UniProtKB/Swiss-Prot annotation:
GO terms for molecular function: ATP binding; hydrolase activity. It catalyses: ATP + H2O = ADP + phosphate + H(+). It comes from Giardia intestinalis (Giardia lamblia). Its main location: cytoplasm. Pfam families: Actin (PF00022). Actins are highly conserved proteins that are involved in various types of cell motility and are ubiquitously expressed in all eukaryotic cells. Belongs to the actin family. It is found in: Cytoplasm, Cytoskeleton. GO terms for cellular component: cytoplasm; cytoskeleton. This is Actin. Its EC number is 3.6.4.-. The keyword Cell membrane does not apply.
Length: 375
């Protein structure tokens, strides 16, 4: 793609959509992956009537809208709504004509082939893009860290994956997933805050809980000792001012919330913690590459942003693996945008030109071309 018409990169997340132009350092648009439709025809009289509200606008009007999230646990579930998100992305956020730009989209690991073909079909037939590519989010996150081999722990809003990548290719047989991710953590934070006397029940208040989670929570290196210390002193207590001016104190919820990533049983789940997922994924890989994977553990996604997470993960992995093995955790500062940044790098490479699925190839081969060319 030329500098005048750089490729557009869209990272489709369960919680947030990130979009921008290949070659840029960061996405230009970041907005919630949510579509709202008026509950009743008469509710929004006096305002400019719209059939749908998308992203932040939908959340701002959530009281009179029925919200739908087209991506659940990493998979597109509502294609009509997803089209509307992409339309909003092109015309409202980026103000770009789809027909002028190739598009590189991200997908979750093990995305069904039919889903990939559907994305390809929509991009060529609805948006008339000149060229298309789709790549696994974790692979792009690894690229953004300057690596082509490693294991990515990608934990976003809807799903967590451990994805081994060897020389640029993901190894699907070893990919593991957990539904313990951002939304689950926010739910768990809400439970912990309620136990402390704070009540959050509406969807608007859920957003407040999410903000508390993101601003105040941290991962304890030694959970039991921090739990004991929090009962003896106020060292772990922080205050948070609610929108109405009321100030609440937040204590154990600060470290109990992200502890769920390591101990899902705290919320009655029998899923593995992220350290166990990482270990099991590497054990599924060829013995000859395991040491290299342990030396290149890359964190990615918004739910990996907790302070203390890299240190705790290293400690837990060292307890699981044979003595003498080395573990190295990479936690880039911009890791909540890692997949998008990797797509930006890939989409701007001259050597990538031959990888795009062109509109001519689509016309000749149909949507199945996406599964042959997008590896």
């Amino acid at each position: 793609m030329t500098d005048d018409n750089p490729a557009i990169v869209i990272d489709n997340g369960s919680g947030m959509c990130k979009a921008g132009f290949a070659g840029d350092d960061a996405p230009r648009a970041v907005f919630p992956t949510v579509v709202g439709r008026p509950k009743r025809e008469t509710v929004l009289v006096g305002s400019t009537h719209k059939e749908e509200y998308i992203g932040d606008e939908a959340l701002a009007k959530r009281g009179v809208l029925k919200l739908s999230y087209p991506i659940e646990h990493g998979q597109i579930k509502d294609w009509d709504m997803m089209e509307k998100v992409w339309h909003h992305c092109y015309f409202n956020e980026l103000r770009a004509q789809p027909s002028d730009h190739a598009v590189l989209l991200t997908e979750a690991p093990k995305n069904p082939k039919a889903n990939r073909e559907k994305i390809c079909q929509i991009m060529f037939e609805t948006f008339a893009v000149p060229a298309f590519y789709v790549q696994v989010q974790a692979v792009l996150a690894l690229y953004s860290s300057g690596r082509t081999t490693g294991i990515v722990i990608d934990t976003g809003d809807g799903v967590t994956h451990t994805v081994p990548v060897y020389e640029g290719y993901s190894l699907p047989h070893a990919v593991l997933r957990s539904e313990i991710a951002g939304k689950e953590l926010t739910d768990f934070c809400q439970i912990n805050l309620q136990e402390n006397g704070a009540s959050f029940t509406t969807s608007a208040e859920f957003e407040i809980v999410r903000d508390i989670k993101e601003k105040l929570c941290f991962v304890a290196l030694d959970y039991e000792s921090v739990l004991a210390a929090s009962m003896e002193s106020a060292n772990y207590t922080k205050t948070y001012e609610l929108p109405d001016g009321v100030v609440i104190t937040v204590n154990q919820a600060r470290f109990k919330t992200p502890e769920l990533l390591f101990r899902p049983e705290l919320n009655n789940s029998d899923m593995d913690g992220i350290h166990q997922l990482c270990y099991k994924t590497i054990q599924k890989c060829d013995i000859d590459i395991r040491s290299e994977l342990y030396s290149n553990v890359v964190l990615s996604g918004g739910s990996s942003m907790f302070a203390g997470l890299p240190e705790r993960l290293e400690k837990e992995l060292l307890d699981l693996i044979p003595a003498g093995k080395r573990v190295r955790i990479s936690s880039p500062e911009d890791r909540k945008y890692s997949a998008w940044v990797g797509g930006s790098v890939l989409g701007s490479l001259a050597t990538f030109e031959s990888m795009w699925v062109s509109s001519q190839e689509y016309q000749e081969n149909g949507a199945s071309i996406a599964n042959r060319k997008c590896m």
